[in-house]
């Protein structure tokens, strides 16, 4: 079989507790864009148990087809049954492109799927485009610690596979009038691949809001001087109903945990308002927040890239300005 025999864009529609993970909708949105360039449809692959009703939601966000594999062995995610089911779908339908979210599940599942279908995988992509010359998929990701961007091709094998970071791509507006063809598939031998028994699922209680969910992000950089000074950023975030984030140097210095990092080697965010306090604006950081609706930068250096990228720039010491701003907003919003 030649690579010309592979057709279509497939996305993994991840669900947990019968709730579709947001990145799944983002993959469909990007998949529609890619599919338009190569003249095909987008198929969402939905695995689980009792999940058939979720097909309409995937259709509303743009899926042209939804392949549903519904089985008791897929009720809770475990590696082998999910990998076996997805490999079976690939072998039957021969998609040209397969997209997974770069979530804990996607990162566990995608490399195993790619190995079993003997193709490559580009992980943590921040950009996907169709090459106008040969219609191949150009997959771009950070390399060398985020210092360069590498564009990777999979010209000799199919499907072309990538994991995509949550928040990088945009989902389409929901349209409940859009319907998809729903195909119910049965995968043989799932029980033979159950080698882990899940006894209990204990969910962690998040102490802070996920930065990708926040409408207002107050982000600090090396210019904040110390981890203790992030308390003033928390105060500002609390006034506005948001949460705090940071640039990579703050994580490298141990000031904040990795899940607070914005940028190419952290998370991509799109809040309504993004405060950049003491952040110079390295290209790696800008790539993770440049699509925020409003960017407000506070920096001593008026020539800092972050000031240039901001909708509103305040030139001055963030350690002095942030407390004043917090008090002013408290009075305004009281």
Spans of features found by a protein language model:
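N-terminal glycine-rich FAD/FM-binding segment characteristic of electron-transfer flavoproteins
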Residues: 1-334
